[in-house]
Amino acid sequence: MELHNLSSPSPSLSSSVLPPSFSPSPSSAPSAFTTVGGSSGGPCHPTSSSLVSAFLAPILALEFVLGLVGNSLALFIFCIHTRPWTSNTVFLVSLVAADFLLISNLPLRVDYYLLHETWRFGAAACKVNLFMLSTNRTASVVFLTAIALNRYLKVVQPHHVLSRASVGAAARVAGGLWVGILLLNGHLLLSTFSGPSCLSYRVGTKPSASLRWHQALYLLEFFLPLALILFAIVSIGLTIRNRGLGGQAGPQRAMRVLAMVVAVYTICFLPSIIFGMASMVAFWLSACRSLDLCTQLFHGSLAFTYLNSVLDPVLYCFSSPNFLHQSRALLGLTRGRQGPVSDESSYQPSRQWRYREASRKAEAIGKLKVQGEVSLEKEGSSQG
């Protein structure tokens, strides 16, 4: 996601600061930041920081190398050494595909920041670059949420039809999600870009419905999935406690997976949300110095956003025992030959929980029988 400057009568994030999901408006021309109403307070003119460019260029280069190595290893393991696939594997592979969208475009962003935010590859390449970056963010959020909800179904609703979905059904769900993700970000391929910069939004002098929609979508992409993930964590925790699943590997691993999902989610996407909203508040308050600082911090937070391609392989280790085992084997960290490790663990209630439930049912049935006998005795005595 890219952000850069604010400039319109309504509060909005600027092109160097706004994520790619904020589509450029063909009718709007680039302009400086203005105060609310663009009047008496005078315009705000935040400057591009060479310090931010100097920070982002090497960081993104390092993320490219680490992300390429980690995700190449992940793709190799999932495609060659993972048999059979499960619904969880389908969503993990989709996350790998999303990461490669980012990794393949990071070298162009590194070059962009090395040249102090000067794009030299043409408008068509700029459109594709911003489209891929935006698609990566949306896909990462969507499939992290899908992984969390898949774990929720396995633990909390083990007998639900969705919990027993086949690999083919999971693949169709993932395909449908990809179609929606591409449609949400396709506007970037139809937008017009000019000038030396390659930014996802050029703010004009008039606010547009498109801008407000994309701002709302940007926030919704963060808060709605986060709410679903937290709901899954709380539900799984309560289920583990109530059903006595604490001693089973599957439910415990599900909790670790969701904890890792939350960690990746907050580390990668929360900084841009915080500084983006701070930029909007500074814009509303016509605080030019604060606005300049917040937009530069937002721009720098792109390093965290792009970090998801590095952290996702760590998530795969938590989510798939087979992936962890195969990774250790390929890296020479295990001794001897071991059979494949199944990713499917038991999520059924423990023996103690089943015993308690059976006792409760037997007790309830006994009470019903006693009540029935009492009622029969009353009827007999009344007839006599």
From Swiss-Prot:
GO BP field: adenylate cyclase-inhibiting G protein-coupled receptor signaling pathway; G protein-coupled receptor signaling pathway
Cell compartments where the protein resides: Membrane
Alphabetic keyword roster: Disulfide bond, G-protein coupled receptor, Glycoprotein, Membrane, Receptor, Transducer, Transmembrane, Transmembrane helix
GO MF annotations in UniProt: 5(S)-hydroxyperoxy-6E,8Z,11Z,14Z-icosatetraenoic acid binding; 5-hydroxy-6E,8Z,11Z,14Z-icosatetraenoic acid binding; 5-oxo-6E,8Z,11Z,14Z-icosatetraenoic acid binding; G protein-coupled receptor activity
Transmembrane regions listed in the UniProt entry: 59-79, 88-108, 130-152, 173-193, 216-236, 257-277, 298-318
Positions annotated as glycosylated: 5
Membrane topology (Extracellular): 1-58, 109-129, 194-215, 278-297
Pfam family, one: 7tm_1
Bilayer topology term: Multi-pass membrane protein
Region of interest (Disordered), residue spans: 1-21
Principal place of residence: membrane
GO cellular component terms given for this protein: plasma membrane
Tissues in which the protein is found: Expressed in various tissues except brain. Expression is more intense in liver, kidney, peripheral leukocyte, lung, and spleen than in other tissues. Highly expressed in eosinophils, neutrophils, and lung macrophages.
Keyword Hydrolase: no
Start-end of Low complexity biased regions: 7-21
Cytoplasmic compartment residues: 80-87, 153-172, 237-256, 319-384
Disulfide bond sites: 126-198
PROSITE patterns: G_PROTEIN_RECEP_F1_1, G_PROTEIN_RECEP_F1_2
PANTHER family: HYDROXYCARBOXYLIC ACID RECEPTOR 2 (PTHR46048), OXOEICOSANOID RECEPTOR 1 (PTHR46048:SF1)
Family stated for the protein in its record: Belongs to the G-protein coupled receptor 1 family.
Function (record text): Receptor for eicosanoids and polyunsaturated fatty acids such as 5-oxo-6E,8Z,11Z,14Z-eicosatetraenoic acid (5-OXO-ETE), 5(S)-hydroperoxy-6E,8Z,11Z,14Z-eicosatetraenoic acid (5(S)-HPETE) and arachidonic acid. Seems to be coupled to the G(i)/G(o), families of heteromeric G proteins.
Name the record gives this protein: Oxoeicosanoid receptor 1
Native source organism of the sequence: Homo sapiens
